[in-house]
């Protein structure tokens, strides 16, 4: 199979640890070095690389080496590994302002069905992630009821 992108600076080394992957997933193919990437950091549980369709210079993706479409599908040890990598990348890029973004599901703007975290530098008002959503008026009675319901559900969960 011919690589999608070919350049001498792309990484195609074998991954550092076995993982639960999906043969059809583009991110799993990157982890397995079937597709080259601009790899930045690789650990036993995670793989970080530069996004090839960046929102800003330095836009990176951090992906668990475990295939799962949604955050709740991923074992904790893989999730625990991701944020220190985001921190390390932000420090390496000397970022004072940035976004860490993670979407779950198509209508939540997830484009690849493999959990991933975006580290998006925000160097000025026009570059990087531009977010705007309508804030709702707070109904404190409704919010209090939701709070109690969630606490009850959390009591019986991990």
Swiss-Prot record:
The active site is at residue 116. Its EC number is 3.-.-.-. Induction: Expression is increased in response to DNA replication stress. Expression is regulated by ZAP1 during zinc-deficiency via changes in transcription start sites. Expression is also down-regulated during unfolded protein response (UPR). It catalyses: adenosine 5'-phosphoramidate + H2O = AMP + NH4(+). AMP binds at residues 51-52, 103, 109-111, 116-118. It comes from the Eukaryota. Keywords: Hydrolase, Magnesium, Nucleotide-binding. Residues 26-129 form the HIT domain. GO terms for molecular function: adenosine 5'-monophosphoramidase activity; nucleotide binding. Homodimer. Interacts with KIN28. Belongs to the HINT family. Hydrolyzes adenosine 5'-monophosphoramidate substrates such as AMP-morpholidate, AMP-N-alanine methyl ester, AMP-alpha-acetyl lysine methyl ester and AMP-NH2. Plays a role in the regulation of kinase KIN28 function. Essential for growth on galactose media at elevated temperatures. One of its GO terms (cellular component) is nucleus. One of its GO terms (biological process) is nucleotide metabolic process. A motif (Histidine triad motif) lies at residues 114-118. Present with 5410 molecules/cell in log phase SD medium. This is Adenosine 5'-monophosphoramidase HNT1. Its cofactor is Mg(2+). CDD domains: HINT_subgroup (cd01277).
């Amino acid at each position: 199979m011919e690589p999608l992108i070919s350049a001498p600076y792309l990484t195609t080394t074998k991954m550092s640890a076995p993982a639960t992957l999906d043969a059809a997933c583009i991110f799993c193919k990157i982890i397995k070095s079937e597709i080259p990437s601009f790899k930045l950091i690789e650990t036993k549980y995670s793989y970080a690389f530069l996004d090839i369709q960046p929102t800003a210079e330095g836009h990176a993706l951090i992906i668990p080496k475990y295939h799962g479409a949604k955050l709740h599908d991923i074992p904790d040890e893989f999730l625990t590994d991701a944020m220190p990598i985001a921190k390390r990348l932000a420090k390496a890029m000397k970022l004072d302002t940035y976004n860490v973004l993670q979407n779950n599901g198509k209508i939540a703007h997830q484009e690849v069905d493999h959990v991933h975290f975006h580290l998006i530098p925000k160097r000025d008002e026009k570059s990087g992630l531009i977010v705007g959503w309508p804030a709702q008026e707070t109904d404190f009675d409704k919010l209090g009821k939701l709070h109690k319901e969630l606490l009850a559900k959390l009591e019986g969960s991990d």
